[in-house]
Amino acid sequence: MTNTCTPNHKSSYTYEDLLASGRGELFGPKGPQLPAPTMLMMDRVIEMNETGGQYGKGYVEAELDIKPDLFFFGCHFIGDPVMPGCLGLDAMWQLVGFYLGWIGGEGKGRALGVGEVKFTGQVLPTAKKVTYRIHLKRVINRKLIMGVADGEVEVDGRVIYTATDLKVGLFQDTSTF
């Protein structure tokens, strides 16, 4: 992997660390960035490793504290507030990209697809915590750096979304993407 920065190999990250990632400060100027609030879909990363998960190829676990005043509850839907499922899916893509930066990958992260997504529950404003779990299946390190993972979203201890083959790539140039 062409890497001009030292990977930031902590096993957990605070909200301030995640904000630093969004500013391009955590993994260096060429490392992938997380989005800034309000699109940052996690408050902390509580575990990261290169050998864990269902496939033994990497694991990420992160959390989002649910507060009734989160932006989406006021508009999705009026009188029937629920977190959009696409935001949970985006959080999983965010975490795959974060993992690629954590192992030293460089470039701008882009979601490239997902095999299958299932929604079997919802996040309501009465919930307390969302937990995301990412199980890396493989990392491709060629001209394009790409992570492939399975993921799940849990609310208050119950799995409500699952996704297979989440794909995120790191691109040196996104002008023709």
UniProtKB/Swiss-Prot annotation:
Q: According to the UniProt entry, what is the EC number of this protein? A: 4.2.1.59, 5.3.3.14
Under InterPro entries, the record lists:
FabA, FabA_FabZ, HotDog_dom_sf
Reaction catalysed by this chain? a (3R)-hydroxyacyl-[ACP] = a (2E)-enoyl-[ACP] + H2O; (3R)-hydroxydecanoyl-[ACP] = (2E)-decenoyl-[ACP] + H2O; (2E)-decenoyl-[ACP] = (3Z)-decenoyl-[ACP]
Superkingdom field: Bacteria
A GO biological process held by the record: unsaturated fatty acid biosynthetic process
- What are the positions of the active site? H76
Keyword Isomerase set for record: yes
Query: Mind telling me which GO cellular component terms the entry cites?
Result: cytoplasm
Question: What GO molecular functions are on record for this protein?
Answer: (3R)-hydroxyacyl-[acyl-carrier-protein] dehydratase activity; trans-2-decenoyl-acyl-carrier-protein isomerase activity
Whether Glycosyltransferase counts among this entry's keywords is no
Tell me the compartments it is located in: Cytoplasm
Provide the alphabetized UniProt keywords: Cytoplasm, Fatty acid biosynthesis, Fatty acid metabolism, Isomerase, Lipid biosynthesis, Lipid metabolism, Lyase
Q: What pathway is it annotated to?
A: Lipid metabolism; fatty acid biosynthesis
Q: What is this protein's function per UniProt? A: Necessary for the introduction of cis unsaturation into fatty acids. Catalyzes the dehydration of (3R)-3-hydroxydecanoyl-ACP to E-(2)-decenoyl-ACP and then its isomerization to Z-(3)-decenoyl-ACP. Can catalyze the dehydratase reaction for beta-hydroxyacyl-ACPs with saturated chain lengths up to 16:0, being most active on intermediate chain length.
What the record says about family reads: Belongs to the thioester dehydratase family. FabA subfamily.
Assembly description: Homodimer.
Per its record, how is this protein called by name? 3-hydroxydecanoyl-[acyl-carrier-protein] dehydratase
Question: What gene does the UniProt entry assign to this protein?
Answer: fabA
